[in-house]
């Protein structure tokens, strides 16, 4: 075939005249070729391989090459001929078109001849052309062979060689072509309309090879640069699919692959080339292929056409054009083989295969559009399209449409003749496409042959419109549609006729082929069609004849003229249609396409309809197509058909217009639908966005998102810094290597660069570190909510149940309380009273439940509960409940502490009585009896056996109080809970479930601990758990009670009952009603505290409270208010502590549980319920603690007392502002009550110390005596319970307790008053402080109680007296407080409290001094001289002004500027700093000795008061100090020990204030101890630093009131400074003033009325809230500045510890001083916010628990040891050290918490020595000697440890508690827990040391210490021991430190 084809081609090619031969040959070949082509192009390629044909085709191809490259011409002379041939062809094609119009045989013949000529020349020009022409096979083969061969042999080599123009050579390509290894096969390269055959290179290595081939094939048109541009793509045809795919893998190139260069930019595509040579060549090639496929029949036409085509369309070789039509024809033929059955079929297939691919390849658009359009549908259509593509390359867009339409039209027409016509037409079309727009071509195609011819005509005139129109539309699709339309019509007419008319092909083809002229396209088409028919042979001719030829030709002849006219009309019509369509379609290309298709379809239909004959259709088509070229197009023969077609065209136009209108309408409708859809989508999107925004706007979610973003930002920054650091390290390493190696020299510039980079990195790291605390706080805040929610969900049911129970029991309790008021209040000291207390507790348990509900509503009431000793228990419980609720987050275990005091919230659980008493305690406070019962109540909870009687007493108390407060409390609780629920609603169920599950798991872990304590303790624990739950549930009640206790006036607003604290949560209420976050230490303290308050309670509390505190009973509801406050304040800590506590609770049943629970208690109210909390601790440490108690009843009593106080302090602190508020309220009420009680009787006060005091203040004025006796019996019963709980210890304690109760009762009263005064003062400045003071009072009571065995009772009595004194003093102080706020007009005086430095006028100073008396330490500074005068310093202790105990007033005799006064003050502080430490050490020792007796208790109260004062503000501190002084006076009245304690307390207050003004602390201490002695400012270094900074600020700003934020625990972290600053700036004078005023008023009212007006309570609450807010802010600030504060904090801590301890010790013996220091230290932490200071106090007792919340609980326990560490830490002032110390403190504290009561004693001594080192070494020794006091005076330990702790880490045992608390609190919840534990320990130790209970830490400390140590040792033993050791070393009080260490380690 190849040879034949080649031969034929050659003859044909050389002689363009041979075109006819070619057509003939082509025909014969076409059959073969077409078949082969149909199968695939390879046959053609093979043909192309033929030399002759190659030559022939080459020329054909060369034509394009002419354009492509001059070089390729060398392949054959044909190349040279091509240009001339092309011109000739064009001319001939025009002639053919003219002839074609007649559509007569002659025309066809002429067309055929032309085609033949074309074939020859076209073959020369395009190998495809010949096939397209007449000789299908021959031509195709010749053309293909020639072109292929020429291209592959001649051209390929030359292209590569000559292609060197673009690229000299691609080795692969060149080698392949040069070697001419045909074995590889041939490649068809198509560019534009040109198709060239090239020999495949030996190897195609890359696309560059292909590009080189293309460049060599088309050197003129293509360059490597062009081909490499992104806009040019090489496509390879997939024969199977007739689709071009982008050539991605050169391995896909195989023999006969058709590659096409496709310019993605249609405008740039191949229009120039295409129109010129490329189009022709491509058309030729397509024709060749198509013809090979199906040109058998067409070939004659093609042959005839080629000449025409060539002349007609120089741009696009006519042959190619004709060829495409032939392929399309063939498809039609295929469809209707009738036309050219054999030929058509074969060619069609071939055409479809080859042409389609070609068509696809020819036009870039075609490729894409073909896919879209479906040229594939009809192989013929595809062929047409392909041909068209070739033509199209001239105008890709035009061609596409043309192609489409051609393909469709051809597909529609089965006749081959039409195909041929089309082929010619195609040639025309190609040229048309070159000239026309695709739309025009498409239309022409629609008409099919006619259309094509017309489009050829149109192309020039018409095309623009159509073209433009079509391009927008997908030409292919338009073509298809038109084809479809045409086909149906044609079919209806009859396949032959239809096809023929459509293909009126001869004329049409000629016309189309003439497209060069476009006018003649139709004629040529007809001619070509005829020729093709002829060429095809009889079949074609016949087909044409019957279908087209005969009719068509005559028609053409007849109508030629008419046709021309009609065509003109049609052209105009088409123009109209086009314009219309164009306008419409322009809007949417798809619409245009469809409209065009429709138009073409209609035209076709019209043609078919109008011309029943093919001619008519053809005429129509021609008319429409030609009318654009009317002048040039000769009217086809048969005007009538043309006329008909014109009419049809008009109809079509009308229809098209209608369709256009419809389409426009449709478009509008679609637009409307789209708009609607868009609107709908917009609505949906907006809704979603709104939902998302709402979700984002949800505060919780938004906060979470913001925090997460911040965290990611932080992490990103961190990563960046780490990267920088790594790079810097590498750089430095390289420098080191370079420096070490002699070869390279390190330049100074390199080093400097490294240093510069290092500085940058260091700054970045520092910045990052500064940013972390903020992020930490934010993340904690976010987590806090979840934890709270979980707790709430878990505790709410219990809370509700307990509330209901309490409400139910309220009536009974009230009845019992009335009975007790009349019958049993004075039985407090009798053994029967223990039973009574048990019964009362049982009764109170119910009452407490109710009360707790009320308390939840009125948190202030829990403070009232604190008033009486039963009240204290209750108030502890209530605060606990309040705190618990607040701290439940951290640990529901809080309920454990509660359980003592009736497990405040869960009286039912552990000791219904005990729990209820706690709950009822607030009511009890309201009633005198209640307070007395309250104390027993707590004991009762401690001792399950006594629980019943105590519970009854408690219930009665609670009833009395609850009767008053129940409704309000319940309402408040309900409101709070409702709020909480609403808040919780923010959480989704799943989260809650998860949190609940986790919390439950933690709680379950903790619960075993509840049951772990000794038998009694397990029972207590169970009760405690229940009580705690009840407390938690009743938290509102507890708060209510507190409020009631607070003296009808609502105490600090009860924190919302957010959470009930589990018994193990570690929240307790102190006697003062403060909610203490008790860690294990707290539990112990609570136990001890209950003991002292009522012996029964002390006894009972230790076991039960430990159970309660330690047993993670159901989430204690107690202290919801406190909890809320705590939640806010220590949510993060709580969360951490809770997690830790839960985890630790399980393994630390005694110690760990205490620790864990204490953490919780710290978070909650364990410490607040000193007794309650202590019991859990005691229960867990019960064995140890009981042993300790047995060893030393006094110690045990004191230990519990101290512990209770510590717990209270810790609880207060942890509980946060709410706790403080409660405590303050309680303290106030206590003070008032105590005042009354004092007036009434010591015994009464003993009975009512805290709770009684508060209640007495309100209720007890009348019930004082009964209440006192009840307190005694309550104490006894409590003591008995404690004894039972501790077994021996508790019992022993009970006996001494009764004795000491009276003794200590007075002392306790004094202390309590003092503490309460302090608390009141603190309360005024900071409600939390009041709570702390209350705790202090409780502690004091506890300490006193220990003397009797229930030092707590005594303490409470003392607290009661103290409270009364405080109230009086506060009353005085209140005016003073306001005056304090005012700057001195004449001589300036500074009132330095722990939290604030206030400028006072002399008048204000006088008022304050007169009001507060001993509670304020005054230092007169004449010039440089400072004289400390103790307002009411009874004992001549060293005149050390220590903020620990009292506010320090520094009076400058000479008038001066505020700023200068500040400067002076700072100078004084600096001068006094060194002395302060020494003084503190000595003072501590002295105070320890003094306090050994009963000063411990007083001191504890004092410390608490001081802490409270500290936490409040300087003014508060001063008031507290003033209170302390009055208390000290009371102490003087009572006993020197008590006085000492009071002094210590006062000093502590001053120390507490002193952190604000460190020197003042020392001054106050000195004043306290010996006004005559030269005052020394004893401030923990942290405090001192804080004061110094505050003063500095004052110097700058000249503000009258400076907030001193001393965070003892933060000291190490630097939180202290932050706290100080935060406090200094956040705590406004108004707050302290308000608090003080409120407290003073409340106390005053309470004293006279025994009740606080609601308004006062409201005021207190408000002030408390304000304080809380400020505290929170302060905490944040502190946390932010922790690192900065770390050093100062450490210094302050040591100073503070010394001051605190010193102050306390001076007042309460050395131990009290340490304790005060501890409290102070704790207070400084408390100052973080006012609450913080309270927490600091709480940390002393319960503050540690705060820290304890987290790991801190352990620290609390280890606090003694931790204290040492704290000193170290503060001395080290290294955050890491701080962390380590705190960590050890945390662990130790947490672990030791349970054993805290005993451990604190031992630890405190150890710490005391360490403290002693700073200034409490003496205290430390004093602690050892005066262990009872020392334990009682946690500060003693705190002092000793604080000193060192201040030096190292004031966060250790006592100082650590405070420091850890503060530091930890700010640093982390764990620290808060630590603080609690430490405080607990300190308190416990103080209690243990308390002269009443434990004379020396030796006996209790050893057991306690071991226990503590064991517990603490677990967590912090190692650290603790080192800390102790370091403390020893630092303190130089090795003796004490050693014993303590030994004990602790043991």
From Swiss-Prot:
Glycans are attached at residue 357. Disruption phenotype: Mice display a kinky-tail phenotype in about half of homozygotes with defects in the nucleus pulposus and annulus fibrosus of intertebral disks. Shortening and curving of caudal vertebrae 20-25 is apparent by the age of 2 weeks. Residues 1-83, 113-176, 305-324, 339-374, 455-512, 853-875, 891-947, 1008-1221, 1482-1567, 1622-1664, 1691-1946 are annotated as: Disordered. Pfam families: AIP3 (PF03915). Expressed predominantly in the notochord and mesonephros during embryogenesis as well as in other areas such as the epithalamus sulcus, lens vesicle, inner retinal layer, heart, hepatic primordial surface, infundibulum, surface ectoderm, hind gut and limb bud mesenchyme. In adults, expressed in a range of tissues including the nucleus pulposus, corpus callosum, kidney, cardiac muscle, Sertoli cells and hair follicles. The modification Phosphotyrosine is found at residues 244, 393. It comes from the Eukaryota. The modification Phosphothreonine is found at residue 470. Residues 1484-1495 have a biased composition (Acidic residues). Residues 38-47, 477-488, 1176-1194, 1509-1518, 1622-1644, 1765-1777 have a biased composition (Basic and acidic residues). The keyword Phosphoprotein applies. This is Sickle tail protein. The gene is Skt.
